From Swiss-Prot:
Organism, scientific name: Piper cenocladum (Ant piper)
Superkingdom of origin organism: Eukaryota
UniProt family annotation: Belongs to the bacterial ribosomal protein bL32 family.
Compartmental location: Plastid, Chloroplast
One GO cellular component term: large ribosomal subunit
BP term (GO), one: translation
A Pfam family of this chain: Ribosomal_L32p
HAMAP family assigned to the protein according to its UniProt record, in alphabetical order: Ribosomal_bL32
Keyword S-adenosyl-L-methionine: no
Record InterPro entries: Ribosomal_bL32, Ribosomal_bL32_plant/cyanobact, Ribosomal_zn-bd
Keyword Ribosomal protein in record: yes
Keywords from the UniProt entry: Chloroplast, Plastid, Ribonucleoprotein, Ribosomal protein
UniProt-recorded Gene Ontology molecular function terms: structural constituent of ribosome
Name by which UniProt lists this protein: Large ribosomal subunit protein bL32c
Length: 54
């Protein structure tokens, strides 16, 4: 079984965690932006079928 030889420093842990969190932030921002464009009807990359209420 693979075991790390030495303990990872706190600063290295913090850097890696911040990279991980920042990636999540940008993904969430992109998803929210896409949702806003779809809901407002200004989306250029998605075709949403509108159901007619009759």
């Amino acid at each position: 079984m693979a075991v790390p030889k030495k303990r990872t420093s706190i600063s290295k842990k913090r850097i890696r965690r911040n990279i991980w969190k920042k990636r999540g932030y940008w993904e969430a921002k992109r998803a929210f932006s896409l949702a806003k464009s779809i809901s407002s009807g200004r989306s250029k990359s998605f075709f949403v079928l509108q159901k007619n209420k009759q």
